[in-house]
């Protein structure tokens, strides 16, 4: 065997190339210290591809160094590749950190932003420390990363910190190998670093920038860097709404215990019912309002610090949160004692109207830590934007917040990339993300195999895009709903940033079938010749497969609001047999009309009435109308409202057919009187879930037709058995798959039973419990039949409907009890935020197939 290093005059040398997340996480200082410990000389440097090391010394010391390096690497690093080769000793007298080597064609992984570490937090409150109450304290273990990086390699001159030259004290730390700020690129202090200011808009607006168009209320200075934060806390205590510039953009903040200001914020933000997130000073304060399991505490306090959905704690009659709802189901035993809270500390229930769960987070920057400490109460901390617009990140955009904010807590560190807060929960002891953004992106998802460079443009709602290089899928941060120019511009800018950062020139473009999606139009306007249309629900399942590292065929259960089908109709309750190349539709929910199209989504009473009529005729129409009237909130429904729905269905005018499971929940919830009109996506279904206990009895349904897919049973090689999709039609013929009509889940028995229960006086929660159990029952029924026909026993569940904890838990439980392996949601959102990952995989695999490279 050849030696793993070169030996000259008794000295050995080795060259190491390390790829992965190895910049911005203290990797070079770690290598330096490790080399010192093993008495080695040489050097370490950043490159455009990662970190390069040359180490020389006694052969045994070199070997020990190489062995220890991956084992002891910094906790926030991630080594994706570690290459070792021999080298000639250079005779270096010391070990040094060299300047970066820039290769314009190379790329590397980039660290997401990291929440403030314990050491920096301790300094923040130590009056003897020179960073006492400094809002931008950070070190190699924490602080801003991706949101300040403008290019790679990761050096200060290629970040937004370049405009803040280091003072002598910070420079000494930066150059001291024994200091934890050794080569910490965002390093700063009150003397040389960014400063915070509290301002109000003057008459004439903020368009003149931070030096004009504003009234100065307080300014941070070297001897009192946190003065504006104390003044801001006083405004919050007085009931004002503040725009607070944070890590990846602005938050809108107010006192979460003041119902008047909470209502005012919701009104100004045009968000009357959707829940707001709350930031707590610490776990003790949080425990006074929520029940928290140990797994949830771990997620809250993780380096990512996401918003975590937690069940309310009973805070007594005066502060009760929805007396009908009570506390939500907890995730295991609570961790730690309940915190104390006097009456003034009770969070206003309208923060999360009608919800069992509160979106809670802990402060993750020094600025937030200081603000929460000064405020002395929990603060609403919601995205700094108007409803459906991207988050504001800079002063040049702050005019958009003028209708909402009374004052602005700002700073002069620029934000390179706009990032919203991530949102997650814990189910089954595992973190599950609903929104993947700060703290998680741009860390890549590993692909089962390398793919051609691919851009996947994502969905219309909850958009994120995805770019691939090698076996890395860079799923972007949450972009938002692509329904206005501002969000589209944010989307286009973010795509360009990722392409630049990861040195990408996509060869393949994946996009949704829906011709009117802005993401689809963006894709079709791109110059690339190789474009792949990917069916929405197939993309959902493909995302689950990629996250779980699977290529083989599975049973895919994809249920959501709406997605464009191969037949041009609106799908949303689908069961596939599929892999990463293609799929076959084997069952779906019965097609039913949406009277008024989009109006039926905004006014779910229309769906309730239309489906009752379509399924049960005149009798169903009359019974549904009486229920809707008897349980109606404002506005009261008139005879003409019902007549219009009937005419639309009879004539087939503006009543597109859909198989949507999301609309099924809407219809039943509206019949049960939960809500007849919505102000945000999925509202009525979410509120039905909140009222529904576990353990309901299934309603009847009918499964019409046989699941006959034996002829397309999986064979060796990804995609060799798939049919259905037009893009794979020729290949389907090669596989010998015969066309069979999918089975249909008929809903007339369910609607008849629901109407009967409601007429007998059943509560909405009881009916909701039955509906959840019914969906779990027919999912199991169909999966059993597919297993019997194909032998497949792995089920991938995806789609926005599975954000519903009660439904997801129910489906996973019955499937697991019947011997199925379930690929459930994880750190890739189960909703449309994960669609781009699936699109990227399907488009990339399709490209490999076309090239004859898919083995």
Report residues per predicted region:
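Intrinsically disordered, low-complexity, mixed-charge
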Residues: 1-197, 815
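Active-site-adjacent structural elements in enzyme catalytic cores
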Residues: 101-510, 514-527, 569
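A contiguous, well-structured pocket-lining segment that forms one wall/lid of small-molecule binding clefts
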Residues: 193-195, 459-489, 493-497, 613-793, ...
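Conserved phosphate/anionic-ligand binding catalytic regions in large, soluble enzymes, centered on
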Residues: 241-256, 379-390, 560-570, 652-675, ...
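Glycine-rich phosphate-binding loop of actin/hexokinase-like ATP-binding domains
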Residues: 421-445, 452, 553-613, 642-695
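Conserved phosphate-binding/catalytic loops in two-lobed NTP-binding clefts
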Residues: 512, 528-540, 793-795, 811-835
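Glycine-rich phosphate-binding loops at beta-strand->alpha-helix junctions
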Residues: 512-517, 794-810
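Glycine-rich phosphate-binding/hydrolytic loop that grips phosphoryl groups
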Residues: 537-559, 563-565, 604-610, 773, ...
């Amino acid at each position: 065997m050849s030696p793993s290093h070169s030996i000259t005059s008794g000295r050995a040398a080795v060259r190491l190339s390390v790829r992965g997340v190895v910049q911005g996480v203290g990797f070079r200082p770690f290598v330096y210290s490790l080399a010192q410990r093993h008495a080695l000389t040489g050097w370490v440097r950043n490159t455009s591809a990662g970190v390069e090391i040359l180490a020389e010394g006694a052969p045994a010391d070199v070997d020990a160094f190489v062995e220890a390096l991956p084992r002891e690497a910094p906790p926030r690093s991630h080594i994706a590749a570690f290459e070792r080769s021999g080298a000639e000793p250079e005779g270096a007298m010391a070990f040094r950190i060299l300047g970066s080597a820039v290769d314009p064609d190379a790329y590397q992984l980039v660290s997401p932003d990291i929440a403030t570490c314990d050491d920096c937090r301790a300094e923040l409150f130590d009056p003897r420390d020179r960073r006492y109450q400094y809002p931008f304290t950070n070190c190699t273990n924490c602080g801003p990363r991706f949101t300040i990086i403008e290019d790679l390699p990761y050096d200060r001159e290629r970040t937004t910190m370049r405009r803040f030259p280091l003072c002598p004290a910070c420079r000494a730390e930066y150059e001291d190998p024994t200091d934890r700020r050794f080569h910490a690129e965002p390093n700063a202090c009150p003397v040389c670093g960014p400063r915070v200011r509290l301002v109000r808009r003057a008459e004439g607006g903020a368009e003149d920038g931070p030096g004009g168009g504003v009234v100065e209320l307080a300014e941070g200075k070297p001897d009192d860097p946190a003065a504006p934060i104390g003044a801001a806390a006083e405004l919050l205590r007085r009931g004002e709404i503040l725009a607070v510039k944070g890590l990846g953009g602005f938050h809108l903040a107010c006192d979460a215990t003041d119902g008047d200001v909470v209502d005012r914020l919701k009104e100004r933000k045009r968000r009357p019912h959707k829940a707001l997130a709350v930031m707590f000073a610490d776990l003790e304060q949080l425990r006074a309002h929520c029940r928290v399991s140990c797994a949830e505490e771990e997620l809250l306090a993780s380096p990512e610090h996401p918003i975590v959905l937690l069940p309310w704690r009973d805070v007594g009659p005066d502060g009760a949160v929805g007396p009908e709802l009570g506390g939500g189901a907890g995730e295991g035993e609570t961790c730690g004692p309940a915190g104390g809270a006097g009456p003034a500390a009770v969070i206003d229930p309208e923060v999360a109207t009608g919800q069992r769960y509160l979106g809670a987070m802990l402060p993750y920057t020094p600025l937030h830590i200081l603000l929460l400490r000064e405020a002395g109460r929990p603060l609403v901390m919601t995205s700094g934007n108007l409803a459906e617009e991207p988050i504001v990140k800079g002063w040049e955009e702050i005019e958009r917040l003028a209708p909402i904010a009374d004052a602005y807590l700002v700073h002069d560190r620029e934000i390179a990339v706009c990032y919203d807060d991530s949102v997650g929960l814990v189910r089954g002891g595992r973190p599950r993300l609903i929104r993947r953004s700060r703290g998680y992106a741009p860390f890549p998802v590993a692909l089962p195999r390398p793919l051609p460079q691919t851009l996947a443009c994502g969905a219309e709602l909850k958009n994120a895009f995805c770019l691939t290089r090698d076996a890395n899928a860079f799923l972007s941060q949450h972009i938002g709903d692509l329904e206005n120019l501002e969000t589209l511009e944010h989307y286009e800018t973010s795509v360009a940033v990722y392409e630049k950062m990861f040195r990408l020139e996509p060869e393949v473009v994946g996009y949704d079938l829906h011709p009117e999606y802005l993401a689809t139009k963006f894709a079709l306007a791109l110059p690339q010749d190789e474009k792949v249309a990917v069916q929405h629900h197939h993309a959902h399942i493909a995302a689950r497969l990629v996250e779980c590292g699977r290529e083989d065929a599975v049973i895919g259960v994809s249920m959501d609001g709406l997605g464009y089908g191969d037949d041009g109709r609106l799908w949303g309750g689908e069961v596939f047999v599929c892999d990463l190349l293609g799929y076959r539709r084997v069952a779906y929910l019965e097609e039913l009309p949406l009277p008024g199209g989009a109006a039926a989504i905004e006014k779910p009473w229309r769906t309730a009435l239309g489906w009752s009529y379509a399924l049960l005729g005149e009798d169903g129409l009359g019974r549904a109308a009486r229920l809707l009237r008897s349980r109606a909130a404002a506005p009261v429904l008139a005879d003409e409202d019902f007549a219009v729905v009937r005419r639309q269905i009879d004539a087939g005018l503006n009543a597109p057919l859909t198989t949507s499971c999301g609309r099924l929940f809407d219809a039943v919830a509206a019949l049960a009187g939960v809500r007849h009109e919505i102000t945000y996506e999925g509202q009525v279904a979410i509120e039905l879930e909140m009222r529904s206990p576990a353990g309901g009895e299934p309603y009847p349904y009918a499964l019409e037709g046989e699941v006959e897919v034996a002829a397309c049973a999986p064979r060796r090689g990804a995609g060799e058995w798939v049919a259905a999709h037009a893009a794979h039609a020729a290949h389907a013929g090669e596989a010998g798959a015969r066309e069979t009509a999918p089975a249909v889940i008929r809903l007339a028995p369910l609607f008849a039973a629901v109407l009967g229960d409601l007429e007998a006086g059943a509560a909405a929660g009881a009916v909701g419990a039955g509906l959840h159990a019914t969906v779990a029952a027919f999912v199991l029924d169909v999966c059993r039949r597919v297993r019997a026909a194909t032998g497949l026993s792995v089920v991938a569940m995806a789609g926005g409907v599975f954000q519903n904890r009660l439904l997801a838990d129910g489906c996973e439980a019955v499937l697991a009890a019947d011997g199925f392996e379930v690929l459930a949601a994880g750190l890739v959102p189960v909703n449309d935020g994960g669609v781009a990952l699936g699109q990227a995989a399907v488009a990339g695999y399709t490209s490999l197939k076309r090239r004859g490279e898919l083995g």
